[in-house]
Amino acid sequence: MLGQFSPGEPYTTSLSSTPPWSPANQFQLFRFRSRTEPIDWRRLSTLDVDRVARDMDVSVLQDFIMTVTFCALEGERCPNCRGPVDPSLVKLLRMSQLSTEYLLQCQDFLSSQLAGLEERLQAATSLVQQGEGQRAELEKSLQETKQENRRRKQLIATQQLLLQASANNYHKCQFCEKSFVNYSYLQAHVQRRHPEVTDAEKQKKRKVEEMEDGIEELKEKLRLTQMQLQEEQQADNLRRQQEQEQQRRREQSEKEALERWKEDERRKFNQEIADLRQLFLQESKEMASKSSSIEAKLLVLQNKEMAGFNNASLQQDSDPEKEMRENRERELRERIARKKSEWRRKFQEAQKRHQQENKELKSENSRLLKALSVEKNSTSSVQKLQQQVVSLSSQLSQKDRLIKSQEEKIKKLSATPVPVSVVSLNDQDSSEEPVEQDRDSQEDSDEPQWKAPKIRKGKPALMRESKPILEESLEQKLENMGLRKGTKGISKQTFKSLSSLLAGQRLQKFRQQTNLQSLRDSLTLEVTRRVKSLQKSSGKPTPNTLKQRGKKTSTPLNEKSLRFRQDSKASDRREKSQQPKTLLPTPTPRSKAPPPNQTPKILAKKNSTPPFSSDEESVEDTAYITSSRGNLSSSVRVVQSGSLLNPTTEPDWTDSELSEDLDLPKIYKTCNPQGSVVQTLTRSLERQLSTPIKTPVGGTRVLPPSSTTPRPAIVKQQALSGEESDSELSSIEELTGRRAGGHKSLEVDRTSGTSA
């Protein structure tokens, strides 16, 4: 049957020269058959195709393969409608039949080929078995031959021994072919027939003896030299052992000193932590007592105010005011709850960041200690590692102190309640409101306004787009200089090496561009001239008046030109002249802006808060919450003390806040790690509580009165060294200068905008 393999069929083409599986032979013999098989529709209807596919029943397929392949479908009609079969379906079925027939032919062909290959495999297997038998026979004969060869060799060896024993009875002359029975005859023959050989032999023997004597002398000298070398080697080994012992003792003493120093530092650190914890607890108790007293007074005032509103004539007017006050209190409580959750989240983030930095510093410390144990022979490397360990431990202690100060600030700000003022609606309040707002706007207008238009004219979108580009270029330059990304500080040795590298690059660029200094001077003069002309034309104060005031900052271009002109001696004189100024407390007048190197310390100007609306929730991280823009009756300004000093304050996601993030390292530098941040916050809060407040007519004072006056702010001026004016760091200085200037000007614009 077609498609089935019968093993009994002869396979005659297996030994032919032409391969039996060639396509030419296959297609010459293959022809499509006619379709004459009948269709058993009943049997086909009882067939379960899904079961056949699921069980892979090949026998059922083998039964139906001939019927499906060679059936005629042209005359078949539908049993229901007796209509002819669709021609397209007939074509499809015929193509499937032809494909199946071709596949059956391929199956038969492959089956025949498989049978031939099996026969050839059997023949090859029989040949291999015959070869194995022959090989076994050959191996057996080889073993017998080897044994015979071994016996023959033994026989030949015994015969050679016998022949050599018989030949030793004769003494053959070395110079001719004669042999003698006795050795005396041989010597007489040599002396008689070969006299020249005997003289040469004597001379040779004499020379050999002389050479042997010289060799003996040389051996004696070599022995003495080896003994001396051994003695010297022993002395050298002893000296090396002594040096190693001394080095080991020195390293042991240094390690003990390092351990003692680490123990002392750890003890000091624990003592400082305990002192700071005690200080924080004491200050938190004081703040809690103050807040409780303020809340008690607030409740008393609220009770008094509520008692005044119980009159029958004002009953109708007090209902909307009461609802408004309740709404404000509810909004304030919700806002305080949000604040607490945000502070708690930031506190956890700061703790995680601190733990990660602590782990990094510990891993760096362990790596340095391992390097210290490996490099035992170099005392200089040990000193360098000790310096690095000291710097890392100091950084770790500073980080811990900063984290502690942040925790205390978070606790204080979360524990401090925000007072709510009970305000009565009177005609006098509404009439006094514009007067107070005008007074505030006049007080805020005392701030320098010559920086504010610059920020108003600026494009925030352009600033947002240029900021990541500048930051990326700065990070690339720092990485090219050898500083890894995320580095928060460098050691003195790294600073010295980078300074020498920058000095060399600066000198090289200066040699490449000889006209750099003249171009710089000309640009400086041109910029100064244009600034003076613009200031004169606009009526703004000139740099001379700013210099006389001593508080307003010049433009970044003027600062850069001044830095380019100053040399190292001038910077030293400026530092010496400014050091006594930094120690004296100087008042900060309203009409002068703080310099860019100072940490701005903004005090509360007015205790008036607007109604809490959604428009004013974006200013939680700034120093001021702006006053109301509407025509409401009264307003109280809430001041968050220490918000400028707190680096983990909630971001406002504005351009001004993005510029404030760049000034955080300066704030960290100005903060004293011994808890001075907490003390500064406490003093500022006490000053705010003790500052006299102007209340509108009909308003109620919610804070206790105090007779203390605010202390003058201590201004810390930082001197810039003249060595930072190189061309490589110019982009860094411009970037930091612009951001610092933008930060200060944005703060000025914000304070002036609150009064508008």
Curated annotation (Swiss-Prot):
GO cellular component, as recorded: centriole; ciliary basal body; cytoplasm
Disruption phenotype: Embryos show defects in otolith formation in the inner ear, but no other overt morphological changes.
Keywords carried by this UniProt record: Cell projection, Cilium, Coiled coil, Cytoplasm, Cytoskeleton, Metal-binding, Zinc, Zinc-finger
Biased composition (Pro residues): 586-598
Gene Ontology molecular function: zinc ion binding
UniProt feature, compositional bias: Polar residues: 534-558
PROSITE patterns from the UniProt entry: ZINC_FINGER_C2H2_1 (PS00028), ZINC_FINGER_C2H2_2 (PS50157)
Source organism superkingdom: Eukaryota
GO biological process: cilium assembly; regulation of protein localization
Biased composition annotated in UniProt, kind: Basic and acidic residues: 193-202, 237-262, 319-335, 344-365, 560-578
Sequence ranges of Low complexity compositional bias: 10-19
Location(s) in or outside the cell: Cytoplasm, Cytoskeleton, Cilium basal body; Cytoplasm, Cytoskeleton, Microtubule organizing center, Centrosome, Centriole
Family that this chain belongs to: Belongs to the DZIP C2H2-type zinc-finger protein family.
Function summary: Involved in primary cilium formation. Probably acts as a transition zone protein required for localization of PKD1/PC1 and PKD2/PC2 to the ciliary membrane.
Entry protein name: Cilium assembly protein DZIP1L
Name of the gene encoding the protein in the UniProt record: dzip1l
